[in-house]
């Protein structure tokens, strides 16, 4: 199925409360487009063969802010998902997050959704440093802290969410363009399968990583000490907390809302 920011379909037309559907099922006759946001689910393991042309150049992707109003909704749910756009990495290599060019009206943060269960991958053991989170949760990766949070990568075929800044999340505003770079280390080539991201050469960032780990969920919080940032939302340095399906979360509360990645001039106190 394919994601549409500009839709809020009614799931059951006979019930006014079943809205917010933003995914459309696709059939065998539908054509997939590079870098669009798709979701594939199967009850059992299955192989998919996707023929097409490889992309070897920069790619501009368009963000819309046209989610229609929902009858009987209130508050932020009136235009549910407004300005939140889902894409997929159609390169055969990982995208370097710090090479992405964001316009000023878009948050310089990549949000990656985790569909897998971390404990299934680690056997229940605690693993630090890789920024893993529980299934059903988004991981916020700000552009300027990406090397420390998630190895600075959007893996090939990985879905990711981009959104307008809070001030620019206005209905029916102009589209915005984000540029995904291919040349000059815009993507990270993989010569062989990797079990973990390779080392990234970058200036050291002063940070504190806090892990919440239990039998039912796992979550992460990153605090960065960076001169010139504040206790409010600093675009490119802070990542908002998206609350998913797990029952326990960890985040820092700021004047601009909860953050999963928070940068300030000091993290003392």
Can you annotate each of these PLM segments?
Residues 4-269:
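Compositionally biased Ser/Thr/Gly- and acidic/asparagine-rich
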Residues 1:
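Internal, well-ordered alpha/beta segment that forms a basic, Gly-enriched binding/recognition surface
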